[in-house]
């Protein structure tokens, strides 16, 4: 979760911009703001060769993104206890699909450069927008909802994952969602290293995941508005800074959360067509329609 602070701050900003009430369960909201990323931490130890749950996380970023999110919203109409998590999930999806093309293009695909890019952006965003120094502020307590995920959330997530991703979930037990959540908290506690002791003990192996105040001075946020290309459609050129993309995502997420809340509070059972269109079926990774099956390949790495 190298991007965790950014997603939490974005979620908080959506609620503030929209004039929405604060979440009833802030930790659950902030956990929801991490979207499906917690799945990538299942059995994250380098000596454990088991990527079943991680593969589900990858599939959720690339396929049936819209239908899964719409089903989550529909479930939360009746199951009010999961609304904080679902609202956070919405904000995660919108920020990812808006900013990931830029991040992929500037990070490239070698080693852990994607994580390194997101860790750096996390530090810059948290410092500017929330006055938080990520390297000396523990993250795990902000999304620690207890020893296990709430039953209602686990039930819904598991059932919808099996509906939309039958191949990836075939060999995954429901309890492994809780394992992934607990492994995420373990990883965040390991990566929290304000004094550099763990970095020394691991011979620098945690560097791509560790927040630090020290990194090379480069234009990570494209504040110079230099040209960059869409990594999956390289003929499509852009000049937006990260902040421009942030504002675009903020506008879109605020509108979708508003439509979602209106749906939840209405007596209408049918899913609103305006909300369906606003969500679409957009890949978290490419920001394009999932049905196009595009793959990010182009890059001009900043590292």
What are these regions (language model features)?
Residues 1-86, 93-303:
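N-terminal leader/auxiliary helical segments
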């Amino acid at each position: 979760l190298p991007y965790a602070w950014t997603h939490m701050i974005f979620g908080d900003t959506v609620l503030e911009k929209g004039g929405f009430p604060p979440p009833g369960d802030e930790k659950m909201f902030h956990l929801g703001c991490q979207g499906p990323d917690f799945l990538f931490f299942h059995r994250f130890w380098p000596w454990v060769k088991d990527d079943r749950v991680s593969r589900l996380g990858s599939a959720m970023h690339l396929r049936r993104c819209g239908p899964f999110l719409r089903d989550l919203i529909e479930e939360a109409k009746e199951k009010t206890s999961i609304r904080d998590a679902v609202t956070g999930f919405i904000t995660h999806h919108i920020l990812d699909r808006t900013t990931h093309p830029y991040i992929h293009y500037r990070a490239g695909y070698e080693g852990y450069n994607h994580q390194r890019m997101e860790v750096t952006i996390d530090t810059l965003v948290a410092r500017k927008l929330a006055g938080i120094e990520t390297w000396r502020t523990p993250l795990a307590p902000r999304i620690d909802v207890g020893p296990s995920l709430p039953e209602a959330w686990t039930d819904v997530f598991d059932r919808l994952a099996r509906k939309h991703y039958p191949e990836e979930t075939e060999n995954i037990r429901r309890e492994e969602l809780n394992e992934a959540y607990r492994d995420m908290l373990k990883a965040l506690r390991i990566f929290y290293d304000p004094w550099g002791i763990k970095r020394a003990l691991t011979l620098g192996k945690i560097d791509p995941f560790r927040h630090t105040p020290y990194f090379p001075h480069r234009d990570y946020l494209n504040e110079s508005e230099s040209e960059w290309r869409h990594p999956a459609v390289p003929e499509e050129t852009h000049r937006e800074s990260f902040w421009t993309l942030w504002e675009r995502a903020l506008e879109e997420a605020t509108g979708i959360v508003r439509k979602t809340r209106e749906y939840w509070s209405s007596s209408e059972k049918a899913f609103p067509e305006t909300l369906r269109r606003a969500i679409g079926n957009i890949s978290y990774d490419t920001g394009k329609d999932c049905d196009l099956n595009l793959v990010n390949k182009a890059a001009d790495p900043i590292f």
